[in-house]
């Protein structure tokens, strides 16, 4: 299978740049740390919705940022959870006075890093709650996973 990749070390950054160029009316892309927010912010007094996870399954997660969906998305490296630092920046940008809800897929790295970011946000007086999505019916108990993962159902939770 042929992939459209210029540089494997810059694939996430280049994907975000392309997404921003294709949808400037929908999203704003922030760099260092990398995350995506809605171009038109949600009204004050509304809960901000933030999700994220490893890159490599685009348009997930940035493709679900916009009106009626996520307020921010945090991409990790390819197939790798984002670290707490960019996860912390996203709720800061997505908070509209009513707290933030992290929508997290049940992958160990995602859960650990989003929970760590939620604790850090709490220290900055940003109220963060977390929903862990574990809708994967293919895996219940396995030596290789921590239970059911979050897959397609994550989209509906964000909606």
Can you annotate each of these PLM segments?
Residues 57, 64-97:
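Glycine-rich oxoanion-binding loops at beta->alpha junctions
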Residues 2, 47-54, 70-73, 99-108, ...:
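Short glycine-rich or small-residue beta-strand-to-loop segments that form or flank ligand, phosphate
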Residues 58-61, 84-88, 109-115, 138-141:
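Short glycine/serine/threonine-rich phosphate/pyrophosphate-binding segments
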Residues 133-159:
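Short alpha-helices
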Residues 111-125, 144:
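Short Gly/Thr/Asp-enriched flexible loops that form oxyanion-binding sites at enzyme active sites
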Residues 35-44, 88-98:
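Glycine-rich phosphate/diphosphate-binding loops that line cofactor/substrate pockets in enzymes
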Residues 1-49:
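N-terminal amphipathic/basic leader segments beginning at the initiator methionine
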Residues 44-52, 61-74, 137-141:
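Gly-rich Lys/Arg/Thr-decorated short loops/hinges at beta-loop-alpha junctions or inter-strand turns
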């Amino acid at each position: 299978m042929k992939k459209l990749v210029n540089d494997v070390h810059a694939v996430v950054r280049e994907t975000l740049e392309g997404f921003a160029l294709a949808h400037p009316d929908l999203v704003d892309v922030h760099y260092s740390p990398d995350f995506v927010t809605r171009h038109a912010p949600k009204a004050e007094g509304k809960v901000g919705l933030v999700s994220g996870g490893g890159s490599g399954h685009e348009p997930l997660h940035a493709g679900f940022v916009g009106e009626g969906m996520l307020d921010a998305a945090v991409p990790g490296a390819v197939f790798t959870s984002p670290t707490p630092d960019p996860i912390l920046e996203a709720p800061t940008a997505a908070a509209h006075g009513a707290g933030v809800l992290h929508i997290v897929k049940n992958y160990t790295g995602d859960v650990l890093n989003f929970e760590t970011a939620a604790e850090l946000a709490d220290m900055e007086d940003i109220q963060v709650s977390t929903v862990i999505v574990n809708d994967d019916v293919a895996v219940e108990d396995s030596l290789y996973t921590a239970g059911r993962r979050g897959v397609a159902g994550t989209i509906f939770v964000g909606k």
